[in-house]
């Protein structure tokens, strides 16, 4: 009996230690690296465009939110996908190589010893950004589009752009503004809820069907309303609605996305807006699931609920605003 008790105590202790250790390991894994972006000339404004996915059935009009940038030595506009789910900005190795080959004037600015571009200054709207270090991610297009008017996607613009600043996203006008403070005219019309920016994830509390949960705002999940668990997906689906299933690429890994219409609203303080769609994802790795669990994430919001609206990411003031 004593031996059995000792074994049980040892198992319990092991579970406690591994749980605590796992928590701190995941917290460390979830941390963002040092911010490498220096932004000048605030406030700055820029238009943005939508990249469509015409291969999906049905076609997706708002697959990615792209922001035009100007790279030294390149005569055509390049684009970065704006992804608040990415804690740091990066470039795509194949796209950078193609750009350097097509436009020799970019070779100095886009030199990448040890897979890192250093001290790149690029134009963003009517301002400038100095990126001290930009890692290269395997991927991108090995050839530039033949159509000179087609977007040249060279990387991801992450949430490091937001740190200590205010971002206004005007979906109706396809325009963004990065500033040091919230414009007074918009602040007067906005409903605000508290915002957290731990490890450069945009997190805030919102309610769905009366239940308040912590949500992460991820512009990289562009064509989604609410991404949640399969159980919540089944509960929130509109009765009789036909779900759609599509394959999506997530950092080089193919996942399966299940989406369906929902009658549920997203409640931000006193404001309510339709979620429109609810989604769950198949194919997440164990590490991704553990990161989600230990981050305290209750759901992930894409751009869909905010289409046609104006939102304010006031990271400096720790609040998320919906303009009425």
Where are these regions (language model features)?
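Pepsin/retropepsin-fold aspartyl endopeptidases
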Residues: 2-324
């Amino acid at each position: 009996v004593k031996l059995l008790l000792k074994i049980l105590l040892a198992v319990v202790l092991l579970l406690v230690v591994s749980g605590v250790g796992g928590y701190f390991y995941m917290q460390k894994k979830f941390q963002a690296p040092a911010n490498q972006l220096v932004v000048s000339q605030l406030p700055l404004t820029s238009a943005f465009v939508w990249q469509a996915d015409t291969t999906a059935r049905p076609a997706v009009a708002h697959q990615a939110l792209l922001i035009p940038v100007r790279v030294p030595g390149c005569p055509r506009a390049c684009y970065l996908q704006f992804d608040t789910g990415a804690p740091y900005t990066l470039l795509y190795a194949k796209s950078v190589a193609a750009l350097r080959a097509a436009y020799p004037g970019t070779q100095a600015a886009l030199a990448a010893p040890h897979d890192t571009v250093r001290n790149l200054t690029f134009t963003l709207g009517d301002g400038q950004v100095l990126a001290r270090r930009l890692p290269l991610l395997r991927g991108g297009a090995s050839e530039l589009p033949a159509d000179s008017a087609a977007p040249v996607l060279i990387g991801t613009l992450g949430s490091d752009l937001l740190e200590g600043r205010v971002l206004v996203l005007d979906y109706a006008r396809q325009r963004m503004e990065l500033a040091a403070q919230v414009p007074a005219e918009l602040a007067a019309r906005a409903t605000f809820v508290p915002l957290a920016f731990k490890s450069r994830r945009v997190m805030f509390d919102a309610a769905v069907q009366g239940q308040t949960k912590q949500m992460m705002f991820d512009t990289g999940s562009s064509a989604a309303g609410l991404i949640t668990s399969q159980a919540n997906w089944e509960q929130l689906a509109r009765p009789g609605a036909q779900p759609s299933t599509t394959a999506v690429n997530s950092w080089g890994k193919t996942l399966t996305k299940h989406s369906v219409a929902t009658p549920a609203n997203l409640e931000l303080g006193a404001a309510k807006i339709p979620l429109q769609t609810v989604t769950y994802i198949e194919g997440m790795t164990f590490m991704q699931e553990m990161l989600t669990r230990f981050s305290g994430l209750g759901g992930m919001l894409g751009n869909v609920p905010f289409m046609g609206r104006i939102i304010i990411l006031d990271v400096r003031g720790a609040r998320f605003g919906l303009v009425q």
